[in-house]
Amino acid sequence: MSILPSFGFTQEQVACVCEVLQQGGNLERLGRFLWSLPACDHLHKNESVLKAKAVVAFHRGNFRELYKILESYQFSTHNHPKMQQLWLKAHYVEAEKLRGRPLGAVGKYRVRRKFPLPRTIWDGEETSYCFKEKSRSVLREWYTHNPYPSPREKRELAEATGLTTTQVSNWFKNRRQRDRAAEAKERENGENNGVGGKQSQRSPLDGVKSLMSSSEDEFSPPQSPEHSSVLLLQGTMNNPAAPAYPMPGLGAPHPLHGMQGHPHQIQDSLLGSLTSSLVDLGS
């Protein structure tokens, strides 16, 4: 433990002052203290001093200096969470200033993808939704055996994963909700498939027939005299023996002796008679 020349403090004492000022939130005073340190490479490479410099740089909005510090020194694992927080928050602030609006969850995700954590403050293990994959594996394994852990089990899981009890509780709650939603969707799809199978057994013409009949009933235009005559003709053709209804101006229909059983001859005779009658009406 050697006293730094022309300063009066040891390196350990300087590191202790940096830690105390950080924990107390006295960042302006911490900045002045760092500025007063002598130009000693050994001192300025101390991890507590570098961490204090990073905190002050973020506090003052000097993000370029912050990134330089975080990328140039291999920080200890126990300091990774704090340094990662500074890295991400700084990039979030820059992105919000550039876009002119706060970032949502998707925006923050894109920033993290664009500016991944440097290996100096990251152990290289993939994280998902802020949980390390190792922690998620422990939670998934427990969930398969018991989706409803007791408070004591949640505390034990929190210790095993490095998470808080609240984080563990929220993870199980969200997982149960996702599973229930997936089961409900599967049931809905199964019911829809069953209904579709029953409908497919019906004739595809059933719906068309009902649609055509309803459309004809609702939208039929008023019948003209010519249309009425055609309907009369059709009825006579369907039942040649039935007498035709008398129409004003029309004579009695011609007898059809000897023509039964010959639809084409009956049709030609009726058409000729009807045409003559219509011509007489028009004259």
Curated annotation (Swiss-Prot):
One of the entry's Gene Ontology molecular-function terms is: DNA-binding transcription factor activity, RNA polymerase II-specific
Pfam short name (any one): SIX1_SD
Alphabetical keyword list: Activator, Apoptosis, Cytoplasm, Developmental protein, DNA-binding, Homeobox, Nucleus, Repressor, Transcription, Transcription regulation
Which ranges of the sequence are annotated as binding DNA? 124-183
The phenotype of cells or organisms lacking this gene is: Morpholino knockdown of the protein disrupts both skeletal muscle development in the trunk and cranial muscle development. Disrupts myogenesis by interfering with the proliferation of dermomyotomal cells expressing pax7.
Tell me which stretches of the chain form a coiled coil: none
Which BP terms does GO give this entry?
apoptotic process; regulation of inner ear receptor cell differentiation; regulation of skeletal muscle cell proliferation; regulation of transcription by RNA polymerase II; skeletal muscle fiber development
Start-end of Low complexity biased regions: 237-248
Q: PANTHER family this protein is in?
A: HOMEOBOX PROTEIN SIX, HOMEOBOX PROTEIN SIX1
Q: What does this protein do?
A: Transcription factor that is involved in the regulation of cell proliferation, apoptosis and embryonic development. Depending on context, functions as a transcriptional repressor or activator. Plays an important role in the development of the inner ear, where it promotes hair cell proliferation and inhibits proliferation of neural progenitor cells. Required for normal myogenesis. Plays a role in the development of fast muscle fibers throughout the body, as well as the development of craniofacial muscles.
**Protein name in UniProt:** Homeobox protein six1a
Gene encoding this polypeptide? Answer: six1a
